[in-house]
């Protein structure tokens, strides 16, 4: 595993050692030998097939005679060897191995299931397997035996089946796979629905959605809406999957927006915090799509509802609402945004004291975007108030919060000019609290970076004349941060 392709010069010798293990009378030794070949083939891809020639025949014979776990290991070994072969040989071996794979689809053994899925992934990528063959011979059994509720409860198998479905879609096309996933999307079992949404999002992310006809689009959106409405777990995959499909459809989403937004607005007033959180998260993802569809009235309506929800008491939900508002600010014409920016910002300032990580990051990002896009709509006094709140966040134990606070501080300094901010920061260097002095020194460095060192240096050098150790140390720290930034 550590050597990877560096194993190639030693393959011949290793195969000489391993080949007798494939015909050993003890089952565990045959299994270990086959697993070793599978690992070596995987590591040496796409080279080294000549070294494996001596084990092909015993593997081939073993595949026809063995059953159970031994067969699973032999299948895994041959499955990893096929990608190393020339197209002609690969086609022949693929055709033969697929017969065994088809036969073993209904095996109850988990090891066999994993081996079958691995072989299917490898064979789908070879030229010998045609889309027609996969649609007619493989897909029906694959969906019948693997797309079942029990698979959704096994985390490892769940991921394998989802990934194999995405690989299969590259050969048979997105419409065929999505058509077969509509039933699991509507299933009563939530883990099964979640698994189906993960698969749909992988397929759409991989191949796009251009090939879907109008009827299939309607059925897909309907099924995703059902999955979203029925969700009771914390899995973010459902609304993210919905977002991937909506983003792929883009302007084709326009006919579906009204019912979707109606459901989101109902969910934002739901008694369950989890439902409200997921509704706000989906809202954040859909806002760029709403903008692309030209539904600006709908965007303003959403913005008003989100603004009215800022009194949310659950921090997880509040963080998602702030994220959605941030998305709305990015996608709107700020001169026409409702409610206006000068009404939104004073409402946000008290929320800066909330020390929940998700709230901190999202509120700072939202204020930073407003400071970058429309600073003139907010009074300088309000920006100064926000600057002092941000100073506290510069000493946050969370690195992501500190980084976002730094960027936002710089945006505000650019918006209102460095003079007022610098006066307040330089005064902070005289206080007794060390942490505040360090944060102020960092902030001075950020102001210098955002507005240019020439705006900050004269004031800093003037302040350095103050015969106070704290002030002088603070100025030196600020200079260090300025050079660092």
Where are these regions (language model features)?
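Alpha-solenoid helical repeat scaffolds
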Residues: 3-10, 44-48, 70, 89-90, ...
């Amino acid at each position: 595993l550590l050597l990877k392709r560096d194993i190639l010069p030693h393959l011949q010798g290793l195969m000489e050692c391993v080949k007798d293990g494939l015909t050993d009378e003890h089952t565990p030794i045959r299994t270990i030998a086959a697993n070793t070949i599978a690992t070596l083939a995987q590591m040496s891809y796409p080279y080294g097939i000549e070294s494996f020639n001596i084990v092909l025949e015993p593997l081939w014979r073993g595949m026809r005679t063995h059953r159970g776990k031994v067969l699973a290991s032999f299948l895994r070994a041959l499955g990893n060897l096929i990608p190393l072969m020339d197209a002609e040989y690969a086609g022949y071996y693929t055709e033969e191995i697929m017969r065994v794979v088809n036969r073993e689809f209904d095996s109850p053994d988990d090891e066999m299931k994993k081996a079958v899925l691995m072989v299917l992934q490898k064979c789908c990528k070879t030229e010998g397997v045609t889309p027609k063959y996969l649609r007619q011979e493989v897909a029906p059994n694959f969906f019948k035996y693997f797309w079942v509720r029990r698979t959704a409860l096994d985390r490892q198998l769940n991921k394998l089946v989802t990934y194999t479905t995405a690989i299969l879609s590259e050969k048979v096309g997105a419409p065929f796979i999505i058509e077969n996933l509509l039933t699991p999307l509507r299933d009563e079992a939530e883990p099964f629905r979640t698994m189906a949404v993960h698969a749909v999002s992988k397929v759409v992310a991989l191949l796009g959605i251009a090939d879907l006809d109008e009827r299939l689009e309607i059925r897909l959106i309907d099924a995703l809406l059902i999955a979203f409405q029925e969700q009771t777990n914390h899995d973010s995959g459902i609304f993210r999957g919905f977002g991937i499909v909506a983003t792929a459809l883009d302007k084709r989403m326009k006919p579906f927006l009204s019912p979707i937004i109606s459901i989101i607005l109902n969910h934002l007033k739901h008694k369950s915090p989890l439902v409200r959180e997921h509704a706000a998260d989906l809202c954040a993802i859909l806002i760029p799509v709403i903008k692309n569809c030209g539904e600006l009235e709908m965007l303003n309506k959403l913005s008003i509802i989100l603004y009215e929800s800022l009194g949310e008491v659950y921090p997880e939900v509040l963080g998602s609402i702030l994220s959605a508002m941030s998305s709305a600010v990015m996608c709107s014409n700020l001169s026409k945004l409702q409610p206006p920016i000068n009404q939104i910002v004073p409402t946000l300032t008290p929320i800066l004291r909330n020390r929940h990580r998700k709230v901190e990051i999202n509120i700072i990002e939202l204020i930073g975007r407003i400071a970058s896009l429309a600073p003139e709509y907010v009074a300088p006094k309000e920006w100064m108030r926000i600057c002092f709140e941000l100073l506290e966040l510069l000493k946050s134990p969370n690195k992501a919060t500190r980084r976002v606070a730094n960027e936002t501080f710089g945006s505000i300094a650019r918006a209102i000019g460095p003079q007022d901010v610098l006066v307040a920061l330089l005064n902070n260097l005289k206080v007794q609290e060390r942490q505040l002095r360090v944060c102020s020194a960092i902030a001075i460095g950020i102001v210098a970076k955002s507005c240019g060192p020439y705006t900050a240096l004269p004031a800093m050098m003037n302040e350095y004349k103050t015969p106070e150790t704290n002030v002088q140390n603070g100025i030196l720290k600020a200079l260090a941060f300025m050079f660092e930034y």
